[in-house]
């Protein structure tokens, strides 16, 4: 196999898995369809408070954030990536996974790779599920909200849910 572990997504879980891979001297590949790390947190509105629990990160140690603004959390993760040399293939989208014997063949937008293990750490926001209704591609239809202030005083319709919907 090309890799011991193939990691899809570079949010908190993907970063943690990559760090553990380095610590255990595993051959790994992380692919992220977006152009930056952070997963769903990257798409939170500006200054949104992210609630986190203390965690132990491989190579880093104990991390304690109770409430932290999105930007500070992303900055922390970027520092972790730089300090540890974590390698991430940005703008590479996973397209399929096929089991072949004792390994998996993962096809992405850039090629095919074989791996002993595949970890799907893409969270819930990777690619929005569209409703397949007329008008969903119109200019005023949005799938991500980065600055709620631009809609202040306006009527909006939110379709979907989750703790980051509003």
What residues fall within each predicted segment?
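Flexible, glycine-rich phosphate/dinucleotide-binding loops
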Residues: 14, 37, 50, 97, ...
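Glycine-rich active-site loop/strand segments that organize a redox cofactor
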Residues: 39-76
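FAD-binding core/adjacent interface of flavoenzyme oxidoreductases
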Residues: 1-3, 23, 36, 43, ...
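Structured core of small recognition/catalytic domains
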Residues: 2-4, 18, 56, 64-65, ...
């Amino acid at each position: 196999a090309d890799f011991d572990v193939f990691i899809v997504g570079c949010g908190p879980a993907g970063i943690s898995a990559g760090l553990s891979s380095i610590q255990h001297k595993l051959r790994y590949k992380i692919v992220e369809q977006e152009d930056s790390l952070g997963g769903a947190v990257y798409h939170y509105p500006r200054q949104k408070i992210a609630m986190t629990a203390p965690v132990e990160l491989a190579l880093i140690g104990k991390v304690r954030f109770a409430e932290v603004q999105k930007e500070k959390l992303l900055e922390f993760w970027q520092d972790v990536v730089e300090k540890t040399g974590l390698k991430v293939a940005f703008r590479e989208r996973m397209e399929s996974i096929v089991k072949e014997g004792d390994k998996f063949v993962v096809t992405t937008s850039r090629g095919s790779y074989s791996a002993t293990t595949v970890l799907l750490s893409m969270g819930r926001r990777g690619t929005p599920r569209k409703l397949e209704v007329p008008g969903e591609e119109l200019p005023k239809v949005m799938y991500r909200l980065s600055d709620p202030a631009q809609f202040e005083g306006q009527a909006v319709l939110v379709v979907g849910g989750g703790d980051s919907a509003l």
